[in-house]
A protein has these predicted regions:
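Rossmann-like AdoMet
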Residues: 1-81, 88-136, 143-144, 148-156, ...
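Short catalytic/ligand-binding loop motif for oxyanion handling, primarily in non-cytosolic enzymes
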Residues: 89-90, 169, 197-201
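Class I S-adenosylmethionine-dependent transferase superfamily signal
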Residues: 94, 179-182
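Short, structured patches in soluble enzyme cores that scaffold and shape functional sites
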Residues: 137, 162-165, 193-195
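Short, conserved secondary-structure transition motifs
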Residues: 141-143, 196-203
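A short SAM/SAH-binding and catalytic strip from SAM-dependent methyltransferases
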Residues: 155-180
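Conserved beta-strand signature within the Rossmann-like core of class I S-adenosyl-L-methionine
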Residues: 183-198
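Conserved Class I S-adenosyl-L-methionine
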Residues: 204-215
Length: 215
């Protein structure tokens, strides 16, 4: 399996980001998934606690969005780019649906961890031919552009980008302009947002804040 590693994840840049995290006392989210062991632990935790795994209503929301996208995209050729693909389970469900509808599919799983993109690639193996899968390691928060992520997209393919469960890792004012810059006419973006419960945002944040208390 060939994995492309963007310069944002070259050792000198990772070291710079780690030092910046220590100096600012704010750990960059990518260091939660840096090693193989961390990736395995995160995937195990996600499997047990993620609403997309444990809540039928949540899973139905994803499935409904997949069905809507598959129905509305008229192109026969679709290249799915999973931004922050994680273990690739959601992307694989979407790819399976597109495949069942007779679409010619390709897949670029992208994340900050080599281990993570390989897990996603393996998850998609049952649906996407190995020669049509292009694992790509990058840091979307990098000031450098990540246009290389599209290097394997056929000119005749419609680009379908997914951005699932990622927004809590970024400040909106940082990531939203980057997402907008990546999109071109006729692209599609499926984006999940983590919302605080209830109509009172401040009260909703206080309800979920204990979930992030790791002490």
């Amino acid at each position: 399996v060939s994995v492309v590693i963007h310069s944002s994840q070259f050792p000198e840049n990772v070291r710079h980001d780690l030092l910046q995290s220590l100096r600012s006392r704010q750990v960059n989210h990518k260091f939660h998934y840096d090693s193989i062991k961390q990736t395995q632990k995160w995937l195990a935790l996600h499997q047990v606690y993620s609403p997309s795994r444990t809540d039928e209503d949540c899973a139905a929301i994803y499935d409904g969005s997949f069905a809507a996208a598959a129905w509305q995209i008229a192109s026969r050729q679709i290249h799915l780019i999973g931004l922050g693909c994680g273990g690739g389970q959601k992307d694989t469900r979407l790819l399976k649906l597109l495949n069942e509808q007779g679409k010619e599919i390709s897949y670029t799983p992208s994340d900050v961890s080599v281990a993570m993109v390989l897990v996603a690639q393996q998850a998609a193996n049952s649906v996407v031919a190995p020669e049509r899968c292009f694992p790509f390691v990058c840091d979307l928060a990098s000031p450098e552009g990540v246009d290389e992520i599209f290097s394997n997209v056929d000119a005749n393919s419609t680009r379908l980008l997914t951005f699932f469960g990622m927004i809590p890792n970024f400040e909106p004012q940082l990531i939203l302009p980057k997402l907008a810059a990546m999109l071109r006419p006729n692209d599609w973006l499926l984006f999940s947002a983590n919302l605080a419960p209830g109509n009172d945002y401040s009260a909703g944040v206080q309800r979920i804040l204990p979930l992030y208390d790791n002490e």
